[in-house]
């Protein structure tokens, strides 16, 4: 008798083809989708009777610029990431009671673009705005793609790995101008804790 995870895997292969990039780890399935097929595949995931992922419960951006640098990740011989910026969604099928993680990578690192999924799941509207605000990922087809967390005049995207930890500008009230102004950040970066790279077997009971 097949497990629920095996049934989901078979249904995904039946709908999307046997050659889909599907990985299983820790009792979860992750589907990798090329950026140019992102919207098409997600529509199938939502509408196909054997899948029926009616709900997108989360969407986030990722920046893999420093992935594996000085960590134990390389010890596991993980393949190189196909791009710097990725979009990850977590889907829920209420009808079949199963979940799926889906990921796509933006092709252009300088100007990352991914199709908006509002057509599939209208509830991702603010999730996509958040990923745009924090990572600079542009969601093509989004009806109102503007910042949602940072200030209107904010420059840059604070969750990118190359964004300075102390920021670039700060706000203060200027008593002479009697208004809030921006000025270059006055905080001096200070590292007081050495970076520790743990051995590859750390936390694995070995």
From Swiss-Prot:
Classification via PANTHER family: NADH DEHYDROGENASE [UBIQUINONE] IRON-SULFUR PROTEIN 3, MITOCHONDRIAL, NADH DEHYDROGENASE UBIQUINONE IRON-SULFUR PROTEIN 3
Its EC number(s): 7.1.1.-
Protein purpose: NDH-1 shuttles electrons from NADH, via FMN and iron-sulfur (Fe-S) centers, to quinones in the respiratory chain. The immediate electron acceptor for the enzyme in this species is believed to be ubiquinone. Couples the redox reaction to proton translocation (for every two electrons transferred, four hydrogen ions are translocated across the cytoplasmic membrane), and thus conserves the redox energy in a proton gradient.
Catalytic activity annotation: a quinone + NADH + 5 H(+)(in) = a quinol + NAD(+) + 4 H(+)(out)
PROSITE patterns: COMPLEX1_30K
Subcellular localization, as worded in the UniProt entry: Cell inner membrane
This protein's UniProt keywords: Cell inner membrane, Cell membrane, Membrane, NAD, Quinone, Translocase, Transport, Ubiquinone
InterPro entries according to UniProt: NADH_DH_suC (IPR010218), NADH_quin_OxRdtase_su_C/D-like (IPR037232), NADH_UbQ_OxRdtase_30kDa_su (IPR001268), NADH_UbQ_OxRdtase_CS (IPR020396)
Similarity remark: Belongs to the complex I 30 kDa subunit family.
Species classification: Bacteria, Pseudomonadati, Pseudomonadota, Betaproteobacteria, Burkholderiales
Name of the featured protein: NADH-quinone oxidoreductase subunit C
């Amino acid at each position: 008798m097949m497990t629920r995870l095996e049934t989901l895997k078979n249904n995904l292969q039946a709908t999307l083809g046997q050659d889909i990039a599907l990985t299983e780890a820790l009792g979860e399935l992750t589907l990798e989708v090329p950026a140019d097929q992102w919207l098409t595949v997600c529509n199938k995931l939502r509408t196909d009777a054997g899948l029926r992922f009616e709900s997108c419960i989360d969407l986030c951006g990722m920046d893999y610029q420093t992935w594996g640098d000085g960590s134990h990740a390389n010890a596991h011989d993980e393949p190189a990431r196909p791009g710097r910026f990725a979009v990850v969604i977590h889907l829920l099928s209420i009808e079949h009671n199963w979940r799926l993680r889906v990921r796509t990578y933006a092709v252009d690192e300088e100007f990352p673009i991914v199709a908006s999924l509002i057509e599939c799941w209208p509830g991702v509207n603010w999730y996509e705005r958040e990923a745009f605000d924090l990572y600079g990922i542009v969601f093509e087809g989004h009806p109102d793609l503007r910042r949602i967390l940072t200030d209107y005049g904010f420059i840059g995207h604070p969750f990118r790995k190359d964004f300075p930890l102390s920021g670039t500008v700060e706000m203060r009230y200027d008593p002479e101008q009697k208004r809030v102004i921006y000025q270059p950040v006055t905080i001096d970066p200070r590292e007081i804790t050495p970076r520790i790279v743990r051995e590859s077997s750390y936390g694995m009971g070995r």
